[in-house]
Amino acid sequence: MAREPRCRRVEYMPRVECFKPAGIPLSRLEEVQIKVEELEAIRLKDYLRLEQEDCARRMQVSRPTFQRILVEARAKIAYALSSGRAIRIEGGNYCMGAGYCRRRQREIREGEPCDFKGIAIRTESDATDN
């Protein structure tokens, strides 16, 4: 039996939840879902240009886990851009920086790990990602 997924620490929530090709109504486009923690990995590594070890530390994951998140995010973005699909940012297993843990449903302090032990709630898109 697989262990429960751990929360990834996210410092930034996107202001928009969907990007799409210009001139085509969203209702006519297929979508690719990017999880919030995947966008955070892209932001830390590619936008802020941090070293992978620093990115992993900020997200409170191991370096191999960070690498897997980053590779998955880049593959999804490349697929969406090359095939003209919309990109929707939603879902995932994450907690906001030193703030609110959506899974534990309470405030967490700076440096406090999210050790949520409840039942992991998988979204429909999580089930299709495997």
From Swiss-Prot:
Coiled coil: none annotated. Pfam families: DUF134. This is UPF0251 protein Swol_2090. InterPro entries: UPF0251. It comes from the Bacteria. Belongs to the UPF0251 family.
